[in-house]
């Protein structure tokens, strides 16, 4: 009996040493306001604007949009299956000018799991095959010596593995090996926090599903490595990397308990930073909101292994319309210094305008041209003054003197007197 008591005491001590990443509840009105930002996006049902992440975020949140959710999922199924399957063996894309990427396909598979569905039947098999072909193609691009790079990114590579895992679809060890190699400390290049977090979520799903048993030890070590790297990336304010990579980082950390108090302390600090960012209105982008809402409901993408589709959720009501006040005119300087001849022009716009509004006004005034492409996180620049971003290049937004902007052209709202620079950079 004495030995049993000692054993139970030891178990209690070990349990006390294990810390979970827990985010205390936030003000429900603040969370509801966040969810209300997604409602207008759910009325945009064209293929270009459909975003599976919005559906996933709502289903894993404490909020619901009622019949809007059903219509949105129906539109996702119609659009994605028509474009991805209708042209799977044909060069003719028909009306699918904005054919979904493989990253979008992976998120679509997450959306199905968020509705407690598995891909099944002939159509489902073809979708799975397309995602597996994508991973194989990326694997070849990385190369057997790991000196190459994915055509897209390791973020999309990890997302693809996660999506297949959630649907109980196995991928070959050689596919997992590329992601393992990318995060292992003795091979590790520089990866952003959200890329590391997505890889960590993929590894966590593989481990919990008992997939790739021959890689189990490496997967366990990779989860530990990712956790350590994310914790190291915490800023003095409390964000992991930056404010917009913090939600996905928290999703991973919430699935990855560790001994000691470091994890719990870091997550509480992140919660304080997130609260301040929410109160400042930092979260306006639909993709970022959809990654944060599950965290505020103590959920992660890993919950899609066994989703709870009957959990009670509060009905969202549209935000009350505010009567616009008379807006002042502000002056924003737009400059492009990485091209010859350089461009620099003062642009007058309404206060509250986005960078995209500034670009449109500059184009209307003449002497400035640009092109954009839609993505799940919003439009991004593909060409400025006739100069297209090449492979492994992108047009970066900076606030003068030299501060990279974390938000995209449709989200950042410059203040009066600010200078916005568009700079072509390599990565």
UniProtKB/Swiss-Prot annotation:
Record-linked Pfam families: Cobalamin_bind, DUF4430
Task: Name any Gene Ontology BP term.
Answer: cobalamin transport
Q: Which domain of life is it from?
A: Eukaryota
Q: What species is this protein from?
A: Homo sapiens
- What positions does the entry give for cob(II)alamin binding? 104, 152-156, 190-194, 242, 245, 291, 395-397
Primary gene name: TCN2
Name of this chain's protein: Transcobalamin-2
What this protein is reported to do is described as:
Primary vitamin B12-binding and transport protein. Delivers cobalamin to cells.
**Which pairs of positions does the record mark as disulfide bonds?**
21-267, 83-96, 116-309, 165-205
Alphabetical UniProt keywords? Cobalt, Cobalt transport, Disease variant, Disulfide bond, Ion transport, Metal-binding, Secreted, Signal, Transport
């Amino acid at each position: 009996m004495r030995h049993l008591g000692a054993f139970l005491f030891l178990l209690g001590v070990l349990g006390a040493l294990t810390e979970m990443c827990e985010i205390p509840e936030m003000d429900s009105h603040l969370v509801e306001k966040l969810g209300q930002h997604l409602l207008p996006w759910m009325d945009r049902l064209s293929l270009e604007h459909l975003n599976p992440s919005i559906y996933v975020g709502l289903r894993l949140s404490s909020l619901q949009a009622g019949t809007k959710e059903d219509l949105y999922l129906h539109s996702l199924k119609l659009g994605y299956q028509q474009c991805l399957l209708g042209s799977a063996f044909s060069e003719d894309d028909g009306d699918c000018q904005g054919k979904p990427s493989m990253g979008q396909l992976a998120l679509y598979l997450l959306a199905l799991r968020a509705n407690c569905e598995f891909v099944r039947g002939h159509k489902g098999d073809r979708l799975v095959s397309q995602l597996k072909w994508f991973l194989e193609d990326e694997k070849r691009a990385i190369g057997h010596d790991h000196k190459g790079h994915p055509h897209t990114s390791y973020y999309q590579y990890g997302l693809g593995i996660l999506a297949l895992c959630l649907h109980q679809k196995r991928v070959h060890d050689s596919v997992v090996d590329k992601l393992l190699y990318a995060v292992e400390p003795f091979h590790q290049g520089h990866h952003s926090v959200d890329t590391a977090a997505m890889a960590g979520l993929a590894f966590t799903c593989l481990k919990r599903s008992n997939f790739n048993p021959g890689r189990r030890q490496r997967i366990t070590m990779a989860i530990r490595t990712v956790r350590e790297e994310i914790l190291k990336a915490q800023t003095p304010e409390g964000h992991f990397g930056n404010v917009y990579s913090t939600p996905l980082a928290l999703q991973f950390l919430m699935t990855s308990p560790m001994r000691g108090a470091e994890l719990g302390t870091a997550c509480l600090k992140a919660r304080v930073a997130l609260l301040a960012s929410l109160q400042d209105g930092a979260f306006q982008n639909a993709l970022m909101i959809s990654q944060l809402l599950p965290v505020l409901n103590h959920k992660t993408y890993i919950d899609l292994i066994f989703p709870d589709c009957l959990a009670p959720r509060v009905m969202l009501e549209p935000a009350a319309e505010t009567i616009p006040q008379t807006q002042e005119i502000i002056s924003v300087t737009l400059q492009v210094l990485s091209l010859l001849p350089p461009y620099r022009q003062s642009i007058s716009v309404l206060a509250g305008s986005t960078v995209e509004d500034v670009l449109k006004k500059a184009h209307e005034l003449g002497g400035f041209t640009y092109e954009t492409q839609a993505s799940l996180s919003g439009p991004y620049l593909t060409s400025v003054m006739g100069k297209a971003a090449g492979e492994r290049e992108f047009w970066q937004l900076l606030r003068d003197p030299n501060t990279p902007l974390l938000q995209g052209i449709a989200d950042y709202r410059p203040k009066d007197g600010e200078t916005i620079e568009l700079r072509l950079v390599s990565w």
